[in-house]
């Protein structure tokens, strides 16, 4: 039995609240159970030096956790003077995931900066961040279209992410902290709404996993991501 009492194929309660803050072009609070992440998408009329003069846009991401997002307080990385390897890995993953579904050539010389700030962590912060950031980017593009700055949205399709793992010999979906810290295999899967894989990160923690278990985990992730994309679309349709 899972610590959360959920079925193996059951997601945590998912909530996507749009327009959560008033300044960013796109702003979303995404909740996967007790995990809560604020995702904003900001539009900048500039691009990195390597893209200047090419008529193409860019999308990048930053990720961070509030000091008391976890059970015990962690020092702000700004106070330490450098980002951890984990932070750099996650923000690069978020950027790659969103660039996979954005037509950068349709942006013009603009940059979208995604900021994902973890307010409360209970496992799956990177997957929640990707799922929420996609909706924030959608809203930022909608604003640009409404203002007449773009003829159409450069967002080609949705992208979402979920964790899966082997917990006590059973493939389970959307691990919370208790499951993540006690599982034998931990995997993060990023997919598009059309079913294409963007990234698969899998690690054997306590024991190796078989090809059959890998296939079962991927099928479980695919099912979960379909439901997450439905939640993204439902959040957009509400307003």
Swiss-Prot record:
Enzyme class: transferase
Gene behind the chain: rph
Subunit structure as annotated in this protein's UniProt entry: Homohexameric ring arranged as a trimer of dimers.
Keyword Transferase: yes
Descriptive protein name: Ribonuclease PH
Entry keywords, A to Z: Nucleotidyltransferase, RNA-binding, rRNA processing, Transferase, tRNA processing, tRNA-binding
Catalytic activity field: tRNA(n+1) + phosphate = tRNA(n) + a ribonucleoside 5'-diphosphate
Pfam assignment, any one: RNase_PH_C
Domain of life from the UniProt record: Bacteria
UniProt lineage: Bacteria, Pseudomonadati, Pseudomonadota, Betaproteobacteria, Rhodocyclales
EC number(s) on file: 2.7.7.56
InterPro entries: ExoRNase_PH_dom1, ExoRNase_PH_dom2, ExoRNase_PH_dom2_sf, PNPase/RNase_PH_dom_sf, Ribosomal_Su5_D2-typ_SF, RNase_PH, RNase_PH_bac-type, RNase_PH_CS
Cross-referenced SUPFAM superfamilies: Ribonuclease PH domain 2-like, Ribosomal protein S5 domain 2-like
PANTHER family, per the entry: EXOSOME COMPLEX COMPONENT (PTHR11953), EXOSOME COMPLEX COMPONENT RRP41 (PTHR11953:SF0)
A Gene Ontology biological process term: tRNA processing
Family assignment from sequence similarity: Belongs to the RNase PH family.
Disulfide pairings: none
Its biological purpose: Phosphorolytic 3'-5' exoribonuclease that plays an important role in tRNA 3'-end maturation. Removes nucleotide residues following the 3'-CCA terminus of tRNAs; can also add nucleotides to the ends of RNA molecules by using nucleoside diphosphates as substrates, but this may not be physiologically important. Probably plays a role in initiation of 16S rRNA degradation (leading to ribosome degradation) during starvation.
Binding site for phosphate: 86, 124-126
Annotated GO MF terms: 3'-5'-RNA exonuclease activity; tRNA binding; tRNA nucleotidyltransferase activity
Keyword tRNA processing: yes
């Amino acid at each position: 039995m899972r610590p959360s009492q959920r079925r193996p194929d059951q997601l945590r309660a998912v909530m996507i609240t749009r327009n959560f803050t008033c300044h960013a072009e796109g702003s979303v609070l995404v909740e996967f159970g007790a995990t809560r992440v604020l995702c904003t998408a900001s539009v900048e009329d500039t691009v990195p030096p390597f893209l200047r003069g090419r008529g193409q846009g860019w999308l990048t991401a930053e990720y961070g956790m509030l000091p008391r997002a976890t059970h015990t307080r962690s020092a702000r990385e700004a106070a330490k003077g450098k980002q951890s390897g984990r932070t750099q890995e996650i923000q690069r993953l978020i950027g790659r995931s969103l660039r996979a579904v954005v037509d950068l050539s349709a942006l013009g010389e603009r940059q979208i900066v995604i900021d994902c700030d973890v307010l409360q962590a209970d496992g799956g912060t990177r997957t929640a961040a990707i799922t929420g950031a996609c909706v924030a980017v959608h809203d930022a593009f909608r604003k640009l279209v409404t203002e007449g700055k773009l003829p159409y949205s450069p967002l080609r399709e949705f992208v979402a992410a979920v964790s899966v793992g082997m917990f006590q010999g059973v493939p389970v979906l959307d691990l919370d902290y208790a499951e993540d810290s006690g599982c034998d295999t931990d995997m993060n899967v990023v997919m598009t709404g059309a079913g294409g894989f963007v990234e698969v990160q899998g690690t054997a923690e306590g024991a190796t996993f078989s090809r059959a278990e890998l296939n079962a985990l991927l099928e479980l992730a695919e099912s979960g991501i379909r439901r997450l994309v439905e939640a993204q679309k439902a959040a957009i349709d509400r307003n």
